[in-house]
Amino acid sequence: MYSIFTSGSTGVPKGVIVNHRSTIDFIDCFTETFGITNEDVIGNQAPFDFDVSVKDIYSSLKTGATLQLIPKMCFSFPTKLLDFLDDRKVTTIIWAVSALCIVTTLNGFEYKRPSSLNKIMFSGEVMPIKHLNAWRVQYPDAMFVNLYGPTEITCNCTYYIICLLYTSPSPRDCS
C-alpha cells in the first residue's frame, strides 16, 4: 500500500511497508470509532511523507468526506489558517500538536473561531495542558482525541477521548 520511514527515535530511521489489509482495517476502525462520515470536511495538515496524513487521505476515501489540503504557508499565519478552516467549513482536524499550538501561541482565536469544527484530534507530541484548554474553551462541544501509535502498526494503537478541562498537577500530587 505504502512505505514510510520511522522517525528514528530508537536509532537510525527505517523504512516500513504497510500493506493494504493493515490500512483497510485501521481506517475501518478509525472512521467508525470517531464517527467520520460523508458529511465531514477533513482539514489536512500533515505532509504526505508523515503517516498522520494516512488518516486524512483514507478516511475521506472510505467515507466520502471532503479532504481539504491546507496550504503549508497557512501554518505561518494563524489568521490565514483560521480563515481557511472557516471558509472551507472544516469539521475535522487530525493534526500534530505543534500545529494546534501555533493557533493558541499566536492568539489566533482573538481573530476568529471557525464555526464548523467538531472533531479535533492530535498526535506526535505531548499536548501542553495550557494549549489543550485554550482549544477546549473555544470548542466545548467538540470531540478532542489524543492519538498515539508508532509507524510500524499503521498509525495509531491507542487513543484517549478527552472529557475534562485539565489543570497542571501539583508536585504534591506526584508523591
How should these model regions be labeled?
Residues M1, S22-D25, V41, K80, ...:
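Amphipathic alpha-helical recognition patches that constitute DNA-binding helices
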Residues F5, A46-P47, P71-K72, V90, ...:
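Conserved donor-binding loops in enzymes that form glycosidic bonds
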